[in-house]
């Protein structure tokens, strides 16, 4: 991350009109905004879409400061806020499609994104085609006359494939297709979406932006071409967040650089250690050559974070359960991006419902981990003890089969 961007994380969203003489923009809670004169009310109505106090759902100064910060960090023309990442994804898509449209969705998308397309979009008469994340230039073969959106998620959910975003965005724009990206892994700082051809960048700010596993929050930053429509459609669909959550997102931005760098350092050490383990088939960490699309990570990203996965050589759920159940520092839980380490296992059969065209066909269990900010030696020791439990049950099974 450049020095300029590090500084921007400290200064973003701290315009004097939001801070009013203090370091952090205060939390401003409001449903009703009152006006002193008819002229003042009328002026607010005219400017209600331009960060003007008008009605609570349009936002308060706390929201405006956070929105400014996200735009300063990611680029684009404006930022819409949502109560979670899934709401940001679904509302971004809903803002631009209608019955009869077609969406190209990466096959390694976040599971709720797939569910949204398969249930809500299908019911609305919008067709979804899932594509292999490594398709690259061949995405042009899947474009239809009614294709409205190309949706990317890079790296992919669980299996971590890094996409060739600039190439795919260029091809999409040749057909006037909107390019949307789930940029949660890049956190808006390690991947600059608008410099790589993205039109709308979406994040579950729940994760690294907030960084403490205690807030649900989503953001969508749009280019100038699409900002007005995204903003107004989101408003019509009633999307808003509490000022307290916006404040916590804004505060999380201040430590985003130092947290991400430590997450990345820790996770790479753990990934390299895992790559040397005899139980591990391969590691899917974007910074390692064993991860699909590693070359695009090297070209397009400025850093990593704590989330990656690895694949075991075998699938033995009883042994995997023993590995997970005895963890001291790795907790089992959904989401990621907080300061704590997390671990979850996916048996090969579980991918049958999560993939349409890009099933990796693993023979062994895939384990996804989020490496937190603990001492990395403690985390490695925790995993080493887990492998001891795992191997004991594998050996027990082998003996019983003799």
Task: Identify the meaning behind each predicted range.
Residues 1-28:
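Short conserved active-site loop signatures built around small residues
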Residues 149, 178, 200, 282, ...:
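Structural preference for beta-strand elements that scaffold enzyme active sites
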Residues 238, 326-335, 386-396:
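A common structural junction motif
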Residues 70, 234-322, 326-327:
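Structural motif of enzymes handling amino- and sulfur-group chemistry
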Residues 37-87, 113-119:
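Conserved N-terminal alpha-helix of the aminotransferase class I/II PLP-enzyme fold
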Residues 287, 325-354:
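Conserved PLP cofactor-binding pocket of PLP-dependent enzymes
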Residues 118-119, 127-129, 259, 314, ...:
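PLP-dependent enzyme catalytic core of the Aspartate aminotransferase-like
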Residues 9-18, 79-277, 397:
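Conserved PLP-enzyme active-site core in the AAT-like
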């Amino acid at each position: 991350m450049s020095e300029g961007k590090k500084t921007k994380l400290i200064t973003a969203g701290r315009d004097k009109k939001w801070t009013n003489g203090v370091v952090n923009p205060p939390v401003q809670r409001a449903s009703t905004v009152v006006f002193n004169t008819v002229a003042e009310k009328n002026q607010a109505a005219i400017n209600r879409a331009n960060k003007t106090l008008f009605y609570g759902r349009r936002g308060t100064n706390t929201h405006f400061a956070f929105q400014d910060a996200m735009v300063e960090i990611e680029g684009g023309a404006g930022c819409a806020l949502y109560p979670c990442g899934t709401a940001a994804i679904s509302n971004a898509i809903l803002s631009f499609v209608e019955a009869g449209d077609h969406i190209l969705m990466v096959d390694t998308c976040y599971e709720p994104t797939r569910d949204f397309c398969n249930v809500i979009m299908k019911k609305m008469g919008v067709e979804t085609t899932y594509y292999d994340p490594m398709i690259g230039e061949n995405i042009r073969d899947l474009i239809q006359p009614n294709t409205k959106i190309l949706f990317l998620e890079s790296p992919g959910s669980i299996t971590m494939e890094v996409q060739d975003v600039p190439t795919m965005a260029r091809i999409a724009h040749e057909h006037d297709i909107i390019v949307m990206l789930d940029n949660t892994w890049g956190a808006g700082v390690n991947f600059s979406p608008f410099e790589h051809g993205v039109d709308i960048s979406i994040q579950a700010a729940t994760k690294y932006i907030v960084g403490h596993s205690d807030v649900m929050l989503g953001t969508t930053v749009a280019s100038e071409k699409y900002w007005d429509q995204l903003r107004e459609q989101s408003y019509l669909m009633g999307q808003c967040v509490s000022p307290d959550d916006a404040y916590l997102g804004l505060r999380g931005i201040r430590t985003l650089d130092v947290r991400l760098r430590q997450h990345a350092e820790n996770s790479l050490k753990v990934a390299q250690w895992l790559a040397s383990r005899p139980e591990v088939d391969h590691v899917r960490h974007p910074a390692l050559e064993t991860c699909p699309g590693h070359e695009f990570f090297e070209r397009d990203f400025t850093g990593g974070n704590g989330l990656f996965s690895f694949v075991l050589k075998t699938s033995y759920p009883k042994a995997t359960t023993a590995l997970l159940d005895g963890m001291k520092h790795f907790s089992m839980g959904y989401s990621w991006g907080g300061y704590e380490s997390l671990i979850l296992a996916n048996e090969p059969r579980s991918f049958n419902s999560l993939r349409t065209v890009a099933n990796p066909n693993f023979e062994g269990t895939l384990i996804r981990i989020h490496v937190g900010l603990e001492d990395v030696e403690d985390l490695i020791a925790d995993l080493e003890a887990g492998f001891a439990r795992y191997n004991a049950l594998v050996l027990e099974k082998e003996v019983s089969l003799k």
